[in-house]
Structure formats: C-alpha cells, structure tokens
Amino acid sequence: MQRRSFILKTGIIGAAAITAPQLIFAQEQEEEEVTYSIEELMGKADIDLYGKGINLRKEAHDAFKKMKVAAYSAGIDLKIVSSYRNYYRQEGIWERKYLKYTDDQKMKPLNAIDKIIEYSTIPGTSRHHWGTDIDIIDGYQKTSGDVLVPKKFEEGGPFEDLKKWMDENANDFGFYLVYTNNKKRRGFKYEPWHYSYAPISKPMLEQFRGKNIMRLVKEQQLLGGEHFTAGFLKSYIVNNILDINPELL
C-alpha cells in the first residue's frame, strides 16, 4: 500500500510538473495573439482611452497612475502635455507646419519636410496614435514659453529633477524614453519628455513594421506627399520609426 501510494503521489507530482509549463506556455501564446488593426496602428480607429488628462490604453493608464503616485513622494508632479493623438490631429499639425515653412518662410518643399521631421511624424506613423506614449513635464515647476525644449530638462532647467527621477524609475513602471540622447542615433531629435509604455508599444511596433508602410503613407495623399520618394520613405522608416531606444524594439 505504501509503495502504491508513493507511485500515485509521484505520478501526480510529475503530471503537475509537466502541466504547469504547458499552462504557462498556453498563457504566453494567448498574450502573443493580441493583434491590432491597421486603423489602430495609424490612429484612425476609435479606441478605449482612460483617465482625464491621461488618455492612454487601460494597462498603460494604470501603470502611469502608479508611477505618478511614486513621483509625488519625490516632490514631482508628472503632468502629461500630450498622449493619444489620432491621425487627423497629426495631419493638422503636419499641414500647419508645412504651410508655415513653405508659404511663410519660403522653404523648398523637401527642405520643409526635413524640417518637420526633426520632431514631428508623418501622419499615420506617429507612436502617439497607439495610446501608449506620453510627453511629460513636472507640473510643479513654473516656466514660460514652449515646455518641450531639451534645455529645460538639463541641469539648471525647470525639469532637471523630473529627468533624473525618470532616468532612475521610469523603467520600473514599464515606461522607456523613445528618442534617446545617443549621438549615433538618427531620425528624430532627442526628446527627454517622450516616454512609451513598452509592454504594449513593442508588439504594436512589431506589427506595424510588418505592414507596407511606404504604400500606406503614399495612399494618404498628404500635403507635400508628392515629394515622398521611395528613397525618402525608406530612410524615414529606418531612421525615424526604427532608430529608437533598443529597449522598445
């Protein structure tokens, strides 16, 4: 009886040992099966957004709220100045800048486009379309003029303490700086205010880069879009969309 009992117990333990990894693998597979429509990826879908003044997907919203509470203990008020931005809002930003540079400043179209993509994305390709990315400042600090200026996040600037705190703590909450201050990085200029919630934005980027981005951009018929050559768009994809913090790839 004792031997039979031992065999039964070891059999149960063995089955559990086999089943547990299988369950974990099944859960991982289920998580990996989350897919995003091209409309979601390009900011043309209506998605559920959470939080007044936050406007992020649920998981990203919850993570930000926890990070915000933690920052309070360091005397910092994490304030979002930009988060979700749909395609049409991005299109408005693009058109306003294009007309400003070509009409007001008399730039040639190609020069105007190069100027725009120093900081602004081509509509349909913005990470802000995903409900995962935020531009932040310290709400406790008073400053005049444009707040999203790299110098204001440096030593002696109003957001110096915010930058230091985020450098030390943001990753613990799943947020990573997107456009880092890496001299070898190309594409968009350094943005010390722009963070992305990696658990969602990484799979979204992976799915987006699997699409024919060149064709999708050309189909939008954007102002100045006739100057989007194949060479320009290839460079834009490699440098502006993909040359980011490696932790987000």
Enumerate the predicted regions with their spans.
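Extracytoplasmic cell-surface/polysaccharide-interacting catalytic and binding patches
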Residues: 2-249
